[in-house]
Amino acid sequence: MNNRVHQGHLARKRFGQNFLNDRFVIDSIVSAINPQKGQAMVEIGPGLAALTEPVGERLDKLTVIELDRDLAARLQTHPFLGPKLTIYQQDAMTMNFGELSAQLGQPLRVFGNLPYNISTPLMFHLFSYTDAIADMHFMLQKEVVNRLVAGPNSKEYGRLSVMAQYYCQVIPVLEVPPSAFTPPPKVDSAVVRLVPHATMPYPVKDIRVLSRITTEAFNQRRKTIRNSLGNLFSVETLTEMGIDPAMRAENISVAQYCQMANYLSENAPLKES
């Protein structure tokens, strides 16, 4: 028996497809999402509708984004979901969530069992639309969830941690074993809730500057920031900001990264691209 086949559909490796089939896990995720009629619910990667069906039962309308044309066609003809669905057969990485929110007339509630091969770039894509998003619930590789929630002074803490926590409150919801999927992935999974901050705790003047600083610091995470960020900040400047130049990227808090970004925006702003 081919364990990549589920409900007659062959899971495609290039799309990173693993289909959720554990009823307890599904019910737990739907309870965490708590969908309500009238909300602008958007599912990324509905697949074989493991979450789509129980969420759709509670709603009059549901928007889904599915790259796989065969799965999109199955959803179109679904006996009870079909009429409720607005289906975008496209890559979520190309979706303008700001325009979608404007069309639906309210902030989006986004959820999904995300393909692990695109989960990190998709997170960064969604962060650029947090003004249009009320909250997000995602099934991800457990390692990615650990990175999203990590604090300074841990090996999981990295650029993804800083950028996620800059934009959102990040809350782990539950852990999910490989046995909950067909085919079983080789890694553990977890569900995370991301709620965009209503008021930014550490506002930055130019997000591109924060992105640049975190990229340069974490690309050389074993170096002290005196070296990894030496092209941007002098030792004196770091010391004036109360940041020890002997620290490494993983020792610096989100607030401190934002402080550095604002200093750079004021003193050496990036040119408009």
Swiss-Prot record:
What SUPFAM superfamilies has UniProt attached to this entry?
S-adenosyl-L-methionine-dependent methyltransferases (SSF53335)
Under InterPro entries, the record lists: KsgA/Erm, rRNA_Ade_diMease-like_C, rRNA_Ade_Mease_Trfase_CS, rRNA_Ade_methylase_Trfase_N, rRNA_adenine_dimethylase, SAM-dependent_MTases_sf
Pfam families reported in the protein's UniProt record: RrnaAD
Q: Which UniProt keywords apply?
A: Cytoplasm, Methyltransferase, RNA-binding, rRNA processing, S-adenosyl-L-methionine, Transferase
**Which Gene Ontology molecular-function terms are recorded?**
16S rRNA (adenine(1518)-N(6)/adenine(1519)-N(6))-dimethyltransferase activity; RNA binding; rRNA (adenine-N6,N6-)-dimethyltransferase activity
- Which terms under GO biological process does the entry name? rRNA methylation
The subcellular location is: Cytoplasm
Could you tell me what this protein does?
Specifically dimethylates two adjacent adenosines (A1518 and A1519) in the loop of a conserved hairpin near the 3'-end of 16S rRNA in the 30S particle. May play a critical role in biogenesis of 30S subunits.
Q: What is this protein called?
A: Ribosomal RNA small subunit methyltransferase A
Naturally occurring in which organism (per UniProt): Salmonella typhimurium (strain LT2 / SGSC1412 / ATCC 700720)
Q: What is the lineage of its organism?
A: Bacteria, Pseudomonadati, Pseudomonadota, Gammaproteobacteria, Enterobacterales
